[in-house]
Design a protein with these regions (language model features):
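Processing junctions and N-termini across compartments
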Residues: 23, 137-140
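Extracytoplasmic c-type cytochrome modules immediately beyond a signal peptide or single-pass transmembrane anchor
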Residues: 30-138
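The canonical Cys-X-X-Cys-His
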Residues: 139-151
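Sec/Tat signal peptide C-region and signal peptidase I cleavage site
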Residues: 23-31
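Bacterial N-terminal signal peptides
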Residues: 12-24
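Bacterial N-terminal signal peptides that target proteins for export
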Residues: 2-15
């Protein structure tokens, strides 16, 4: 076996291990969640999957495939605050108490995500790759910003 093959095998093994750990952690994080907490966790998982798929579609130059995914992200952002009623914190929820201490700030963060995802929908429908990429980056930035402020580590 060549050094190159050994390196490829090690890389493949490390990738498989990382993925299985990631999926296990996700399953563990969602275990025990019920009701609205489980629903919002599922929406966030779908959102993350949509963002990953959009990245792939950009690489393939398939803006048409981005439209329904960006629409799902936009639609989730619009209804997101309703999935955080008072008293829906505590484990297994990963929601920070800061959401309820600054609910108007949380609503603004969800609206920023809605606006950028809507721009992504518009740009992808128009076939404007540059605008779509910029809107995608802005959408991802709103996710990161919101998680920094409103998600437990």
């Amino acid at each position: 076996m060549t050094l190159r093959n050994m390196a490829l095998r090690k890389t493949a093994l490390a990738t498989a291990l990382a993925l299985s750990c990631g999926f296990s952690m996700l399953a563990y994080a969602h275990s025990g969640a019920t009701g609205i907490v489980k629903e919002r966790m599922d929406f966030f998982t779908q959102n993350k999957d949509d963002l990953k798929a959009i990245k792939t579609h950009f690489r393939n130059g398939d803006l048409d495939a981005i439209v329904p995914l960006a629409t799902q992200i936009r639609d989730w952002a619009e209804k997101m605050p309703a999935y955080f009623p008072a008293g829906s914190d505590g484990r297994p929820s990963e929601a920070s108490p800061q959401i309820w201490l600054d609910f108007s700030g949380f609503e603004r963060a969800a609206n920023a995500n809605y606006q950028t995802a809507n721009q992504l929908v518009i740009a992808a429908k128009a076939g404007d790759s540059k605008a779509a990429i910029n809107a995608f980056k802005a959408t991802a930035a709103t996710c990161k910003s919101c998680h920094k402020s409103y998600k437990l580590d």
